[in-house]
Amino acid sequence: MNLDEIKNRLASLNNKGGGKKTDYAANFWKPKEGTKSQIRIVPSKFNKDFPFNELYFYFGIGKPRMLALSNFDTTDPILEFATKLRKSGDQTNMDLAKKLFPKLRVFAPVYVRGEEDKGVRFWEFGKMVYQELLGVMSDEDYGDITDVASGRDITVEVIPAKETGKMFNTTTVRVKPNQTPLAPEATTVESLLDTQKEIISLYKKYQFDEMKDILQGWLKPADEDGGKETEKVESKGKVDINAKLDNLFD
């Protein structure tokens, strides 16, 4: 009996999300609802020409999220299956495909004013904030807002949905007019640049077979008490999901 293997399996089961355990507070920054925060986007240690990282995730299939294998230019069973469903022409399958396709999330390394002791962390946001930031950074009048000597801070505000009448909170970004250094000391700047982590390393990379099993479990859920598959309701004209799975993974 291998005791280490038993302990590893127990740890895996206890980690219900199935993903890599990460100290969220140490690695990520999330703006607080109803407040304004002042931050600085820091040049990326891993790509000095572009500070943002675009990653695609599956939500609701593997809890809490799964990093898509397409981020690694690797064959992805969920993406392949979603693509086949979309091409089927059947509306039910196309609706399911929409749920399965990975969603874009963007990450930027940031230095939060007032929380300098926490160093560089990652700020995660969606397409709308991303487009706004890219629009500002493409404007030559602003210059390089990430420049460590003469860049610009950004004010981030999260407006609660109840104030806007929208379904979700609204995040606004405003670039400060003054140009300022990232930090007063050169040694601090050097440390902020050199100690950054690679964002993709903070998430578990699933293997093809792992993702296939998770997808099959999501499509054909089993009862917790007996492991019996739930009854599937057939409908005329709908492509059989089981057949699709069999054809894809044969």
Regions found by a protein language model. Give the residues of each.
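OB-fold ssDNA-binding interfaces and closely related basic DNA-contact patches used
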Residues: 1-141, 209
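Intrinsic-disorder/low-complexity linker and hinge segments
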Residues: 13-23, 222-243
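Residue-level recognition of well-ordered secondary-structure positions
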Residues: 77, 111, 152-155, 246
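Short acidic, low-complexity intrinsically disordered linear motifs used
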Residues: 77-80, 234-250
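Compact mixed alphabeta submodule
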Residues: 113-233
